[in-house]
Swiss-Prot record:
EC identifiers of the protein: 5.4.3.8
Species, as recorded: Pyrobaculum aerophilum (strain ATCC 51768 / DSM 7523 / JCM 9630 / CIP 104966 / NBRC 100827 / IM2)
Name under which the protein is recorded: Glutamate-1-semialdehyde 2,1-aminomutase
A Gene Ontology BP annotation from the UniProt entry: protoporphyrinogen IX biosynthetic process
Modified residues (N6-(pyridoxal phosphate)lysine): 258
Pfam family name, one: Aminotran_3
Gene: hemL
Keyword hit for Zinc-finger: no
Amino acid sequence: MLFERAKSVFPGGVNSPARALKHLPSPLVAKAASGAYLYTDRGKLVDYCMAFGAIILGHAHPRVKKAVEEQLEKGWIYALLTEQEVEFAERIRRHMPSVEKMRIVNTGTEATMSAIRAARGYTKRDVIIKFEGNFHGSHDYVLVKAGSGAATWGIPTSAGIPQEVARLTVVVPYNDIDAFIKAVREVGDRLAAVIVEPVAGNYGLIIPDVEFLKALREETQRAGALLIFDEVITGFRVGLGGAQGLFGIRPDLTTLGKVVGGGFPIGIFGGRGEVMDLVAPSGPVYNAGTYNAHPVSIAAGLAVLKELETGEPYRIANEAAERLAKGVEDVAGRLGFDVVVKRMASMFQFYFKKGDVKTPQDVRESNEKMYLKLHEIALKHGVYLTPSQYEVNFTSAAHGREVVEETLAALEKSFQELQREIG
């Protein structure tokens, strides 16, 4: 069995924890992907994980494939400056004017780690504020959780992180303006930066209160600290201008990833010119990497940006998410399930609970076991939902009307089967 072989060479049998699918007997094994579909050891599945949001045009999109093939013909790594990466950065800046200068790295984790380092270098301060339920990668600065109280110095969420490092991060409830302002006052002149997912997409889908985001902007400016928008998920997913364009808020620094790499490894951190000019080689904030601005990732990302600039992929993906969100709400309601559905652009998630979902606490109060059971049942009916209520479902430009109808029919059967199982 492949999973047994995998467990003999990988911790837990996988190379990222989210792939473990612990509620199933074994993880899904991918064989191929095309358009809206995954081909796996469990058959052909309509994919709503979409590589946790990295794919927006659809799997193996022909124009992305062509761009990558053309790059491979010319070589795949030079460790030198290329014209393509300059054009790529110029396009990003055109759509996100706050990103005046940027550094292209390889992962979202690298991007947030480097953005925080740049903020500390610029402000000459050491403490950062992050928010409960926001995920910013797997580095020591941000793998922390709140202790007891509304705003607390961080506690490591992973073994191997020194307490002294975690104490440089203060964790505050998401969407809570009063708690945030209190934390800013308590940290005082040690506050280097506030990092936030402007739309929380790593604890389910939590839509921000716009006044909350405005308060982050106002208070960081007042405190002389930097505001970092982590748009690894939302950047070029919710629109060409990202969440910052959607809400009209200009952060000091931004991190990007996922969509802008076209399915290849990428991360970007960038923002105000005077901050980014502190990054090596023009300044003392160190960042370097053999694979930075990898030509294949740049080629794929450039192809994706050109497609997105037509607007058509957004129209299809957003319409699909809207129809699916309404469809889930309808079928769940008809069958007597208490379900809350949240959607933004081509992102959606649903929760088995009464009332709204505005905070991480609301997500925790949802019936996670019910979601996991539905996920398992939906696989039998040919639909791969995102594997946890703490993740987000994504649509793409490949999720046209026929795919959506196929999905809704399968989900109706899945909810009916769930109803029979719970009696």
